[in-house]
């Protein structure tokens, strides 16, 4: 099994990163370089999380071998060396090789490749690709130029920070500047920035994740929160449609002014390709190909303005598409949660859906997840399961907070992570060591990464599932992962006292900490910032528990879901009404489709039989008629059939209620024939101003 576990985890982590990227990204529409860059960043970060437990178990085995080699057989105590505590005699307690043992020399090379590749991605390549993807240039040269200009300040800041550390080391008379020390300074600067952000995200996730499961077990909580999301998403959806309309109006004007032989026509064609298909069909070229442009009597947009318009179109189309998909997903969630609320009082213990799933389910899932099992899970088991899971996660959070505040204490050892690992180290239970390390670092990663997936920065950074994340957000997430994962793992090794700078023992370090270098070059960071700054997680957890951040966002006008707030109640009621209208609309559509299906099944076959009999009894002499008469007869029958079909459609038209008004407007803004595209009419009442009328 030597090295086999490492190879299996490398393959498994690759497919895990590929699966998550497929869920959030769009392989068909997004650029290949964006997909490859994001996949590589996620893959390297996940590798660090999954491979680090193997490094810990291998290091413990190497420490045992080193202690056994330095111990004399007749004596029962070890020489002052790797272990400060007494070790048993090797003949009585031999060092067992772990099942996942990695041969010497592999892990240092592996960590160097993974770490420095991830650092190159996060500090150099991904920021450049981010600016390149957001650029509205029409050529590769133009996009590269824009990306370099945008990143000039970005890279200048890094050079300034690195220069400050460099001056500190150069001025200090007790330090001699060498290449290893320069490397350590760079690693310390990157880890310091990452640890600063890590504690902020960790303090939020340690409280919010257990609380989300506890609140999810409450009856009606998820449904109320879904109503709240529906009201906010409708406002965002209307805003996205208005922005798209404004962008398409500008494109229409540019398309009409710049003719086929204008030098900038290729730029306009590039912009048109980025527009939705329905807008392209509506506008077309919208010009006369035989009409030349006149430079003297017309005012044409510049290339710089077209670049700005191109960037605006890309952003507007992506945001509009994302809100449309999210709205449909939110509707399905709301309908399902309403079904759960209705089925809770069911006496038959059979889960009944209001609407059938549009996608056919797997037969295997249908067999086991039948209506009876679904009722017991959704109405009885799931709330209890969520409560138990919330309690377990809360215990993990308390352990993390306690260990973050006490991991610097070595005598006695107060960090619970260090206590558990040292107990397993005495018996060389490598399976337990790897499982404990993996669960601990996995929980820390979930708390940090889930916060990264949840945060949203003014629509510029937003990870949306169902392939709705844009290139800018994907690359930004890759940058965050590469910056957060190394300090996260270094912090975990400090919690378990596997880092010699924390345990203050002359023991063999892990291969991961060996590539970080000695932090004694920057003692104020190693002995100060790395130890005392993580204690701030206590303050952040308290602030998150009392929802101080949520209340501040509410005061600033960014509405958040709070049960004791009047604005939240108004938005919940508004969202409930929106869901009710959409539900009634879908019910009418399904009823209309059912009536059409019944009409075809009842009268479709009779009409085909009568037509077939009429053709059989037709006079054979009619076949000698001229082609003109044949065409005329066919035209008459076509008109008759069309008239009958129109009558049938009119009979099948759904009768709308008397109070029906908003649903008569169409979702497609292209049906307006005016020169200016009309904004979505039914969303005007849902504008952002209506939300704050009662304030």
From Swiss-Prot:
Keywords: Cell membrane, Coiled coil, Disease variant, Glycoprotein, Intellectual disability, Membrane, Phosphoprotein, Transmembrane, Transmembrane helix. Residues 588-624 have a biased composition (Basic and acidic residues). The modification Phosphoserine is found at residue 633. Glycans are attached at residue 78. One of its GO terms (biological process) is adrenergic receptor signaling pathway. Residues 22-32, 127-150, 208-387, 454-473, 543-695 are cytoplasmic. PANTHER family: G-PROTEIN COUPLED RECEPTOR-ASSOCIATED PROTEIN LMBRD2 (PTHR21355:SF0). This is G-protein coupled receptor-associated protein LMBRD2. It comes from Homo sapiens.
């Amino acid at each position: 099994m030597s090295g086999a576990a490492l190879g299996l985890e490398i393959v498994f982590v690759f497919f895990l990163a590929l699966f998550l990227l497929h869920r959030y990204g769009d392989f068909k529409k997004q650029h290949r370089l964006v997909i490859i860059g994001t996949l590589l960043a996620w893959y390297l970060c996940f590798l660090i999380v999954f491979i680090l437990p193997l490094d810990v178990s291998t290091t413990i085995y190497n420490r045992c071998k080193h202690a056994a080699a330095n111990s004399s057989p007749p004596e029962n105590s070890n020489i002052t060396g790797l272990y400060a505590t007494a070790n048993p005699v090797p003949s009585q307690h031999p060092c067992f090789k772990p099942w996942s043992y990695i041969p010497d020399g592999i892990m240092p090379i592996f960590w160097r490749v993974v770490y420095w590749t991830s650092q190159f991605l996060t500090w150099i390549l991904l920021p450049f690709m981010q600016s390149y993807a957001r650029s509205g240039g029409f050529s590769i040269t133009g996009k590269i130029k824009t990306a370099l200009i945008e990143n000039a300040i970005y890279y200048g800041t890094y050079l300034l920070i690195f220069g400050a550390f460099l001056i500190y080391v150069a001025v200090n008379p007790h330090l001699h500047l060498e290449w290893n020390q320069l490397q350590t300074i760079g690693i310390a600067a990157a880890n310091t920035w990452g640890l600063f952000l890590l504690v902020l995200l960790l303090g939020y996730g340690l409280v919010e994740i257990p609380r989300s499961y506890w609140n999810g077990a409450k009856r009606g909580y998820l449904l109320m929160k879904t109503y709240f999301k529906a009201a906010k998403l409708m406002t965002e959806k209307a805003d996205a449609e208005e922005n798209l309309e404004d962008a398409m109006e500008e494109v229409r004007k540019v398309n009409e002014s710049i003719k086929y032989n204008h030098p900038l026509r290729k730029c306009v064609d590039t912009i048109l390709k980025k527009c939705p298909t329905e807008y392209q069909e509506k506008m077309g070229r919208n010009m006369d190909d035989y009409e030349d442009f006149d430079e003297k009597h017309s005012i044409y947009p510049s290339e710089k303005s077209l670049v700005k318009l191109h960037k605006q179109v890309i952003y507007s189309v992506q945001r509009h598409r994302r809100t449309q998909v999210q709205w449909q997903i939110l509707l399905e969630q709301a309908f399902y949660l309403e079904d759960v609320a209705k089925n809770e009082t069911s006496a038959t213990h059979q889960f009944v859906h209001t609407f059938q799933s549009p996608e056919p389910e797997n037969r295997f899932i249908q067999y086991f997840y039948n209506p009876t099992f679904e009722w017991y899970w959704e109405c009885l088991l799931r709330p209890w399961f969520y409560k138990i899971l919330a309690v377990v996660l809360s215990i993990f959070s308390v352990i993390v907070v306690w260990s973050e505040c006490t991991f610097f204490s070595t005598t006695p050892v107060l960090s619970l992570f260090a206590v558990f690992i040292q107990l397993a180290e005495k018996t060389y239970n490598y399976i337990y060591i790897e499982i404990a390390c993996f669960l601990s670092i996995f929980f820390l990663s979930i708390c940090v990464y889930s916060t990264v997936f949840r945060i949203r920065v003014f629509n510029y950074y937003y990870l949306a599932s169902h392939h709705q994340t844009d290139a800018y957000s994907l690359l930004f997430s890759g940058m965050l992962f590469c910056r957060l994962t190394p300090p996260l793992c270094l912090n975990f090794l400090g919690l378990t006292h596997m880092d010699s700078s924390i345990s203050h023992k002359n023991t063999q370090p892990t291969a991961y900490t060996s590539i970080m270098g000695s932090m004694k070059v920057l003692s104020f960071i190693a002995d100060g910032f790395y130890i005392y700054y993580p204690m701030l997680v206590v303050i952040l957890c308290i602030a998150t528990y009392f929802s101080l951040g949520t209340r501040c966002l509410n005061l600033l006008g960014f509405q958040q879901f709070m049960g004791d707030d009047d604005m939240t109640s108004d938005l919940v009621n508004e969202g409930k009404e929106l869901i009710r209208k959409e539900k009634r609309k879908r019910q009418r559509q399904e009823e209309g489709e059912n009536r059409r299906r019944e009409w075809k099944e009842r009268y479709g076959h009779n009409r085909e039989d009568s037509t077939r009999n009429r053709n059989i009894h037709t006079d054979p002499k009619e076949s000698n008629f001229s082609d003109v008469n044949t065409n005329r007869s066919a035209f008459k029958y076509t008109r008759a059939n069309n008239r009958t079909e129109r009558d049938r459609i009119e009979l099948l038209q759904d009768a709308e209620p008397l109070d029906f008004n908003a649903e008569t407007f169409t979702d497609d803004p292209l049906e307006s024939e005016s020169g200016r595209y009309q904004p979505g009419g039914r969303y005007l009442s849902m504008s952002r101003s209506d939300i704050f009328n009662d304030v």
